[in-house]
From Swiss-Prot:
Its EC number is 2.7.3.9, 2.7.1.202. This is Multiphosphoryl transfer protein 2. Gene3D superfamilies: HPr-like, Mannitol-specific EII, Chain A, Phosphoenolpyruvate-binding domains, Phosphohistidine domain, PtsI, HPr-binding domain. It catalyses: L-histidyl-[protein] + phosphoenolpyruvate = N(pros)-phospho-L-histidyl-[protein] + pyruvate; D-fructose(out) + N(pros)-phospho-L-histidyl-[protein] = D-fructose 1-phosphate(in) + L-histidyl-[protein]. Residues 2-91 form the HPr domain. InterPro entries: HPr-like, HPr-like_sf, PEP-util_enz_mobile_dom, PEP-utilizing_PTS_enzyme, PEP_util_AS, PEP_util_C, PEP_util_CS, Phosphohistidine_dom_sf.
C-alpha cells in the first residue's frame, strides 16, 4: 500500500515551471513511483515529470497528496515530508518588479545579440540604419587662402551685393517652406539683415580687409559673444551666425570656391561635430536616415529641424570613437539613445523588424489624422495639441490635432538676454495660425518666474517656487511685458482663431485686473487703427484649487477653463512633484483628485461654459475612460499621442465611462482605481483570449529573441499592448527563472503583466525550430495575462495547455492546422475558453 504525504500548496503562483522542476529533481533521486494528486481538481501526475506536475493545475491553497510506493518508499516519504514542510513553500520567489526611476536598459531581445553599442543623448526618437557618413562642420577659420582685397570700393560693392543676394535667396526658399523650416529661415533672414552684422562687415572692408576676411572676422566676433553667454539657447545661435556668414561667402565668391560640405548619394547616418540649419536643409531627406552630433541642444535650430522631419537624432556623440566605422553600415536607435556599430545579421534583422512595425503603426494611424475624435456612442470631444513654439504647429496639425489647446509662450522668453518684442511675438503667433488653417489656438500668457526663471527679470530664487512669485502674480510688476504680449496676441487674432488663457489664477481680483489690462490693450489698438478680433475669448487655467469654489463668479467674467492637471494635482495633494521623497503621493488617480475634477467640470457646465484639460494626464491612454466620463469638452496633449488617443476614444462608450468614473470616485485608494481601470480595459472590448490576428504561421523568426520581440510587436499592432518592450521584459524575467520550453518542440512563454491591455494567447508557428533554453521549439504559444486579472486564470490556462501538449493528437492538430482561424478555434475548444 502506498505511503501518503498530505500538504497544502503555499506557493503564491501555484506549481508552474520553476517549482515543478524542484519537485521533479528531488523525486528522481528515488526509485519509488511518486504520484502528485491535486485533491481540488482530482488531477494526478507523475511527480518525476515537471510537465505532468504543471498539468495537475495546482494553485495556492490547494490540498494535495504525494503517493509513494517502491523499494525506498520509507526514505522517500521521510525526505519528501520534510522538504514539502520546510523548503517547498520557499522554492519560488516572486519576480522582482521593474522600477522605472532610472534610464530603462536596452531591450533584452537586443542585448542578447551582444551588439557593440555607443550611448548618446536622444533629442529625436526613432531608429534607422545607414552608412556612417561624416559631414564636415562649418569652420570658417579652417577655410584657408582667403581671397585678397581688390580695393575698398570694390569690396564694399561686392559685400552690399552679396547681402542682397543672401536675403533674396532666403526669401525664395521661404516661398517653398513651412512649419519649422519656415520659422528657421525667418530667423536667418533676420540675421542676414541685422544692422550690427552689416556694420561690422562694412567696418572690416573699410579697414582694408577683403569681403572673405571681413566675413570670417565678423563671424568670429559674434560667435565669441554668444559663446560667453550662460544661456545654452544663445550659445546655439552661434551656429546660425556661421551659417549665414557662409551663405554670404558663397554668394560673393561662388559655390565652387566655397562648396557646401556633404552630399548624400545613399542611405546615410550622418555624423558631425555640429551641423548648421542650412547644411541640414541641403541634405537629401530621401537618403538622410539619422543624425549624430557632438554638440547641439534641444533648442538648436538644427535639432528642431530634425524633429520636424522625424529624423532620429542623438547629441553628445563621441565622434572620434565612431571614426573606425566611417562608410560602414551602422544603426541609430533614438528610442534607446544608442548607436550600434558592426551590426551582425541578427542585429540587422532586429532593426528591420522595428522598421516594419513603425511602418505598420503609421499606416494604422493614418486614418485618424483627418477624422474628428468621437466616442463609440457619438459624443464629440476635441483632441488638441500642446506646443511651445510656432515651429511645432505644422507637425501637430499634421498629426491629427484639431486645435492647439496649450501654446506655452514662456519658452519664447527663456534662454535669452531680453524679452521678445511685440513684432517678434506677433510673427510667431501668425506662423502658428498659418499652420492652423482656421483651427483654434489657445495661447497661454507667460508662465515665468518661480520654477521657470528668466535672468533678465531678476526675480530672486525662492524656497518653494511652485507656490511663489510666478505667472499672473508677476504681471503687475512687469505690466509692460504683459501688455506687449496681449497686443501681439490681439494683433495676430485678426488672422485666425486665437484665444487668451491666463495661468495660475487663484482669485477674482486677478481676473478683474487681467480684464482691465486686456481692455486697455484693445483700446490702444483701436486708437492705432490696428485690426484684431473684438470677440477674442479669455480663459483661465484651473490649477489652483481655490478657483473651484468660485467657478460661478469666474464664469461671469471669462469664456472658458482649461485644467492644468499637473499643477492641480500637486496643489490639491500638497505634493512637490520634483521632490523624490514625496513622489509616491503625487498621483492623479487619487480618488480625491478625481472628485475634484468631476466637481469642477459639472460646475463649469452648469454655467454653460467650455472646459478642457491640458496636463500630462490627457495623453495617458489608461486614464482616457475617466476623462471621457468627466464629460470634458477637449483634451490637449503632445502631438505624437493624438492618433492613438483618437483610436482609443472611438472604442469607448461615454455612458460606460461615466459609470466607471463613479466607481473610481467611490474607491478609497489610488491602487483601487488602478485595479478598476485595468479590469475595465479587459472587459470594455470583450476581446477573446485567442484571436487570429495574434497568430502567425510560417514565421521566419530565427531565434528566441526574434520570437519574443515579434510576438509582443504583434500585440502592439493588435491594440492589446502599448509598451511591447516592457511586456517583453516581463516575459524575459520569467525565462530567466526557468525556460518555458516543454519539449516536443513546443514552448509556452508566459507572464502576468501590467503591460498587456487585453489578456491574450498568441501563437507563432515557425518555419524552422529555434533554440529555447536547452531544447528547441518550433511551435510557440505565448500566454500574456493582465496583472489585475481576477483569480488564477494564468495558472489554470497554463496547466490546461501543459496537459494538452502531452497528447500527440493535440500537438499534431496545432502543427498541421490550415489557418490561423483553425488554430484559434482549436485552442478555444480545447482550453474551454
Amino acid at each position: 500500500m502506498a505511503l501518503i504525504v498530505e500538504f497544502i500548496c503555499e506557493l503564491p503562483n501555484g506549481v508552474h515551471a520553476r517549482p515543478a522542476s524542484h519537485v521533479e529533481t528531488l523525486c528522481n533521486t528515488f526509485s519509488s513511483q511518486i504520484e502528485w494528486h491535486n485533491l481540488r481538481t482530482d488531477r494526478k501526475g507523475n511527480a518525476k515529470s515537471a510537465l505532468a506536475l504543471i498539468g495537475t493545475d495546482t494553485l495556492a491553497g490547494d490540498n494535495c497528496q504525494l503517493l509513494i510506493s517502491g523499494a525506498d518508499e520509507q526514505e522517500a516519504h521521510q525526505r519528501l515530508s520534510q522538504w514539502l514542510r520546510d523548503e517547498f513553500p520557499h522554492c519560488d520567489a516572486p519576480l522582482a518588479e521593474v522600477k522605472s526611476d532610472e534610464l530603462e536598459p536596452l531591450p533584452v531581445s537586443l542585448t542578447n545579440l551582444n551588439p557593440q553599442i555607443i550611448r548618446a543623448r536622444t533629442v529625436c526618437s526613432g531608429s534607422a540604419g545607414g552608412i556612417l557618413t561624416p559631414i564636415s562642420s562649418l569652420d570658417l577659420n579652417a577655410l584657408g587662402n582667403l581671397p585678397a582685397a581688390k580695393g575698398v570700393d570694390a569690396e564694399q560693392s561686392a559685400l552690399e551685393n552679396g547681402l542682397t543676394l543672401v536675403l533674396k535667396n532666403i526669401e525664395f526658399r521661404l516661398l517653398d517652406s513651412d512649419g519649422a523650416t519656415s520659422a528657421i529661415l525667418e530667423a536667418h533672414r533676420s540675421l542676414a539683415g541685422d544692422t550690427s552684422l552689416r556694420e561690422h562687415l562694412l567696418a572690416g572692408v573699410s579697414a582694408g580687409l577683403s569681403c572673405a576676411e571681413a566675413i570670417v572676422a565678423s563671424a568670429n566676433h559674434f560667435c565669441e559673444e554668444f559663446s560667453r553667454s550662460s544661456s545654452s539657447y544663445l550659445q546655439e545661435r552661434a551656429l546660425d551666425v556661421r551659417d549665414v556668414c557662409f551663405q554670404l561667402l558663397q554668394q560673393i565668391y561662388g559655390e565652387q570656391r566655397f562648396p557646401a560640405p556633404g552630399k548624400l548619394t545613399q542611405p546615410a547616418i550622418c555624423m558631425a561635430d555640429e551641423l548648421t540649419p542650412s547644411q541640414f536643409l541641403e541634405l537629401d531627406k530621401n537618403h538622410l536616415k539619422g543624425l549624430l552630433l557632438k554638440s547641439g541642444g534641444t533648442t538648436s535650430h538644427t535639432v528642431i529641424l530634425a524633429r520636424s522631419f522625424n529624423i532620429p537624432t542623438l547629441v553628445g556623440v563621441d565622434i572620434d570613437a565612431l571614426t573606425p566605422w566611417q562608410q560602414q553600415t551602422i544603426y541609430i536607435d533614438g528610442n534607446a539613445g544608442a548607436i550600434v556599430v558592426e551590426p551582425g545579421e541578427a542585429v540587422a534583422r532586429y532593426y528591420q523588424q522595428e522598421a516594419r512595425v513603425q511602418d505598420a503603426l503609421r499606416e494604422q494611424q493614418r486614418v485618424w489624422l483627418t477624422q474628428q475624435a468621437r466616442t463609440a456612442d457619438g459624443i464629440r470631444i476635441e483632441i488638441a495639441a500642446n506646443i511651445a513654439h510656432s515651429v511645432e504647429a505644422q507637425a501637430a496639425f499634421g498629426n491629427g490635432a484639431e486645435g492647439v489647446g496649450l501654446f506655452r509662450t514662456e519658452m519664447l522668453y527663456m534662454d535669452r538676454t531680453s524679452a521678445p518684442g511685440e513684432s517678434e511675438l506677433y510673427n510667431i503667433f501668425c506662423q502658428a495660425l498659418e499652420s492652423a488653417n482656421g483651427r483654434s489656438i489657445i495661447v497661454r500668457t507667460m508662465d515665468i518666474g518661480g520654477d521657470k526663471p528668466v535672468d533678465y527679470l531678476n526675480i530672486p530664487a525662492e524656497a518653494n517656487p511652485f507656490l511663489g512669485y510666478r505667472a499672473v502674480r508677476i504681471y503687475e510688476e512687469y505690466a509692460s511685458l504683459f501688455t506687449t504680449q496681449l497686443r501681439s496676441i490681439l494683433r495676430a487674432s485678426a488672422h485666425g482663431s486665437l484665444k487668451i488663457m491666463i495661468p495660475m489664477i487663484s482669485s477674482m481680483e486677478e481676473i478683474l485686473w487681467v480684464k482691465e489690462k486686456l481692455a486697455e490693450a484693445k483700446q490702444q489698438l483701436r486708437n492705432e487703427h490696428i485690426p484684431f478680433d473684438e470677440k477674442i475669448q479669455l480663459g483661465i487655467m484651473l490649477e489652483v484649487p481655490s478657483v473651484m469654489f468660485i467657478i460661478d463668479q469666474c464664469c461671469e467674467e471669462i469664456d472658458f477653463f482649461s485644467i492644468g492637471s499637473n499643477d492641480l494635482t500637486q496643489y490639491l495633494l500638497a505634493v512637490d512633484r520634483d521632490n523624490a521623497k514625496v513622489t509616491r503621493h503625487y498621483n492623479s488617480l487619487n480618488p480625491a483628485f478625481l472628485r475634484a475634477l468631476d466637481y469642477a467640470v459639472q460646475a463649469v457646465h452648469r454655467q454653460g461654459k467650455w472646459i478642457g484639460l491640458c496636463g500630462e494626464l490627457g495623453a495617458k491612454g489608461s486614464v482616457l475612460p475617466l476623462l471621457v466620463g468627466l464629460g470634458l469638452d477637449e483634451l490637449s496633449m503632445s502631438a505624437p499621442s493624438i492618433p492613438a488617443a483618437k483610436a482609443r476614444m472611438a472604442q469607448l462608450d461615454s455612458r460606460e465611462c461615466r459609470k466607471l468614473l463613479n466607481q473610481a470616485m467611490a474607491c478609497r485608494t489610488s491602487l483601487e482605481v488602478e485595479h478598476l481601470l485595468a479590469q475595465f480595459r479587459m472587459t470594455q472590448q470583450d476581446a477573446p483570449l485567442v484571436t487570429a490576428e495574434c497568430i502567425t504561421l510560417e514565421s521566419d523568426w530565427r531565434s528566441k529573441e526574434e520570437v519574443l520581440k515579434g510576438m509582443t510587436d504583434n500585440l502592439l499592432l493588435a491594440g492589446r499592448c502599448r509598451y511591447p518592450r516592457k511586456l517583453e521584459a516581463d516575459l524575459w524575467a520569467r525565462e530567466a527563472v526557468f525556460s518555458t520550453g516543454l519539449g516536443f518542440s513546443f514552448a509556452i512563454p508566459h507572464s502576468k503583466s501590467e503591460h498587456i491591455e487585453q489578456s491574450t494567447i498568441s501563437v507563432a508557428r515557425l518555419q524552422a525550430p529555434v533554440r529555447w533554453g536547452d531544447d528547441e521549439a518550433q511551435f510557440i504559444i505565448m500566454l500574456t495575462l493582465n496583472k489585475h486579472a481576477a483569480g488564477d486564470q494564468h495558472m489554470r490556462i497554463f496547466s490546461r495547455l501543459a496537459r494538452r501538449i502531452m497528447h500527440e493528437e493535440f500537438r499534431n492538430a496545432l502543427v498541421n492546422a490550415a489557418s490561423a482561424d483553425a488554430i484559434a478555434s482549436l485552442l478555444q475548444h480545447e482550453l474551454e475558453l
